[in-house]
Amino acid sequence: MSTNKSSIEKITLGSFLIALGVVYGDIGTSPLYVMKSIINGNGGLESITPDFILGVLSLIFWTMTLLTTIKYVLITLKADNKGEGGIFSLYTLVRRRAKWLIIPAMVGGSALLADGMLTPAVTVTSSIEGLKILPSFNDIFGNNQDIIIIIVLVILSFLFFIQHFGTEIIGKIFGPVMFIWFAFLAILGIVNLSGNLYLLKALSPHYAIKILFSPNNHLGFFILGGVFLSTTGAEALYSDLGHVGRKNIYLTWPLVKICLLLNYFGQAAWILSQKNNTKLYGIESLNPFFQMMPSWLLLFGVLISTLAAIIASQALISGSYTLVSEAIKLNLFPRLQCLYPSNSKGQIYMPAINRILWIACIAIVLYFRSSDNMEAAYGLSITVTMLMTSILLFNYLLKIKTPLPIALIILVFFGSLEFSFLISSAVKFEKGGFVSVLIALCILSIMYIWIKGHYIKMSLLDYIPIENYKNQLKELKNDVDRPKYATNLVYLTSSEKSKRIERKIMYSILDKRPKRADVYWFVNVIVTDEPYTAEYTVNTFGTDYMVKVQLKLGFRVNQKLNVFLRQIVCELINNGDIKVQNRKYTTLPNRNVGDFRFILINECLSSESKLKSWNSMIIKAKLFIKKFTVSPAKWFGLESSEIEIENVPLILGSTEHTTLKRVYK
């Protein structure tokens, strides 16, 4: 892992392009809709004044500087977990400080996933709507929004369809395309800004404060909801830390920020130059980004912005896979199938998540129909994620011995700033923001049910000392009157204690049908706070037939239990801890490892369980959700192994028994 980490930290032309293609898709496409959202929200071009434009530019500049540059690039990026970033990586760094920190992690993760469903719809629709300005398009289709919707649906459907095959090949063009995109943004901005350099006065925070109280600002304080769209990609920047490394972000962000600001300033210059152009008054969804292009450049502008939007969408889709995968490993989300279409680091494909994202994006496009309506709903959930990150970051700063006053200043300053954006975005709730809130609440509910159900079950399960059954297992092992069930009989246990397992496991071995084996394996898998841990410990209890294994795997490690267990068996045989398992019949010469049989216990809630009504509902809901998750066999990489599934009643809480009384006639 150290080699892998050092390789992504290297600064090369390739790493520079990869960073552009992976990290900045979301924030890099914000010029498509930020100015458009603010101008149209304030009443259109006819309501714009120079002071208003200076104030808007100042707000954008200082929002990007304070939130993206200072909070995320300079402070939060240092909170990496062995090179990995993101809200769940941050949570793993601090979760031992307080149990309640799981709440901001779950809330922030849910909101980030909800944002991932809106972003592809917003960016692709905003770019395709640029076609309306093309004379040739207008001549054929007029102002027909249905055509735009059809094109957007086709692009999004194609994007989700190709996920199954992996994006390694097309991913190679992401960096060069985004380089062209940012260069295009900068050049377009410079051309329009020339002759209007007085707009650079907007770098003073004076104008940002002044506009909030200006009568020219018809939105008042709520203008911050539109301004916030310029920095929504900051959280994604932190999440992608593990893909490109901190040094590459330090190198590329200043260049990206300059390109973005040049474009915003260029749009502002165009707006002021056209504010008396009555032909543009009343234009629905006026977009300065496309309007400021000369007619001969429009087609290229639409094409390159569409490609940038697709790349941004791909980054959000891949980020969603990674986010869910981390949540699963932390036991915050139901187990879903993970596929690896290529050998590239971070190339995960989750069919269930892909289908959900596709359906959600299509539904969002069909419901909102235009980027204007989507922008009105966009950004609300990501403010919640940023607030939750600030809470976790505060605890991380305390963990690394940052003086309490400094940590408090950081929390209060950025927390207040983000809370202001949250309040200003709250007006979006009735305009469509409720969609992202509902999505986030649905995801949060699933997380809550899953983790709460786990805690309820773990608190009530009956654990027993393995050594109490040492003699019985030895007798069963040597009982030649019984047919051998397996050479290696393997059970999965949730007990992290080296000498204990669940009673139901021993019940399966001894009571249900005595299972004779040479070696009984009890395997416990622990997901560590570090991303790429791969360690194990064993306890043989002084025997050669009874082994408790504890696998410690990082939260990004694929849990290939079959592969790991064979490696452990070979090492124990070589060390003399267990006997050589010679096979009389085999196609492999010198094979000294016997066969394996895995017993997977399927829990069914017993009618005898007597739980509090709320806990009972949680357990039933979790078992219902479990029906739609990937099977333990697939999750632990046992598809090609010999497995047997046993149904065991899950009896939780107190039980009530009715005693039958025999009646004699």
Swiss-Prot record:
Pfam families: K_trans, K_trans_C. It catalyses: K(+)(in) + H(+)(in) = K(+)(out) + H(+)(out). The chain crosses the membrane at residues 15-35, 48-68, 100-120, 147-167, 173-193, 219-239, 251-271, 292-312, 348-368, 378-398, 403-423, 431-451. InterPro entries: K+_transporter (IPR003855), K_trans_C (IPR053952), K_trans_N (IPR053951), Kup (IPR023051). GO terms for molecular function: potassium ion transmembrane transporter activity; symporter activity. Disulfide bonds: none annotated. Keywords: Cell membrane, Ion transport, Membrane, Potassium, Potassium transport, Symport, Transmembrane, Transmembrane helix, Transport. It is found in: Cell membrane. Belongs to the HAK/KUP transporter (TC 2.A.72) family. Transport of potassium into the cell. Likely operates as a K(+):H(+) symporter. This is Probable potassium transport system protein Kup. It comes from Clostridium perfringens (strain ATCC 13124 / DSM 756 / JCM 1290 / NCIMB 6125 / NCTC 8237 / Type A).
